[in-house]
Amino acid sequence: MAILVLGGAGYIGSHMVDRLVEKGQEKVVVVDSLVTGHRAAVHPDAIFYQGDLSDQDFMRKVFKENPDVDAVIHFAAYSLVGESMEKPLKYFDNNTAGMVKLLEVMNECGVKYIVFSSTAATYGIPEEIPILETTPQNPINPYGESKLMMETIMKWSDQAYGIKYVPLRYFNVAGANLMVRLVRTRSETHLLPIILQVAQGVREKIMIFGDDYNTPDGTNVRDYVHPFDLADAHLLAVEYLRKGNESTAFNLGSSTGFSNLQILEAARKVTGKEIPAEKADRRPGDPDILIASSEKARTVLGWKPQFDNIEKIIASAWAWHSSHPKGYDDRG
């Protein structure tokens, strides 16, 4: 057997590929367009193809040359909430339409398992905290809507073609496996990496977007999870499907929420740096609070996160940033 990782040259995807190669139990095939990913981030023992999953002839070639692929892990999607508000059609074209084209080729080639990188953004402003897998999904931005549409498309493809799927709904992803070759870099938009860039002196200050949320300190609250733990969850989800289980979704998070100001203070403690901060207006499409209940993943999949507190997650990312002050970029 073999696993195809879509988007395997990106931040989370490269952790996934490293984990698969580390286990050494099956062949690992990677597809990435390198629009946001880095070729050098792909483990040398993985088979790499550069291309777009929406190119069906290209994907047919990948499956034809790797007939032992029976499962796909899908990370290849645009994922910036703010950008999705400005360019919604870009997200529906790449994310949602891309899923249709992928599933058509998977069905044609007889590949029947897919583990999908979904998002907490499908819940929008959640009706309950912590968020359960059964919490109503009402996205408030095109990014979340595009991912929810992808989940719906997979549901009907399962019924029609028997392609079994597991959407893994991530909450905030942060940190770095010290053995991996990539953390978030290049035009960074995520809170923790920017905070650490300020600690390094790469940036002058961190902007805290919004101080009027319905939270104790006025900044929005998020649940954080380490990419190493996400990689383990993906492996468990593939095993779950291969055992003949039915399609189902899982939330992946630490089940503990931290506000932006709490993350800032924790980073100051871990790094020993002042980290200047300035408050700014809210970004459109950001909910007040997103905290997961990952009890289902822990019970059904046997998922056991190793990075179970925010300071540990920050410390792992800071170790990488400290040793790579200019970040990581193979584009010259």
Curated annotation (Swiss-Prot):
Keyword Cell cycle attributed: no
Family the entry assigns: Belongs to the NAD(P)-dependent epimerase/dehydratase family.
Domain of life: Bacteria
GO biological process: galactose catabolic process via UDP-galactose, Leloir pathway
EC nos: 5.1.3.2
An example Gene Ontology molecular-function term: UDP-glucose 4-epimerase activity
Annotated pathway: Carbohydrate metabolism; galactose metabolism
Cofactor(s), by name: NAD(+)
NCBIfam families membership: galE
Binding locations of substrate: 119, 143, 172, 190-191, 207-209, 222, 283-286
Assembly and interaction partners: Homodimer.
Top enzyme category: isomerase
Catalytic activity: UDP-alpha-D-glucose = UDP-alpha-D-galactose
Protein name: UDP-glucose 4-epimerase
Name of one Pfam family that matches: Epimerase
Annotated coiled-coil segments of the chain: none
Protein role: Involved in the metabolism of galactose. Catalyzes the conversion of UDP-galactose (UDP-Gal) to UDP-glucose (UDP-Glc) through a mechanism involving the transient reduction of NAD.
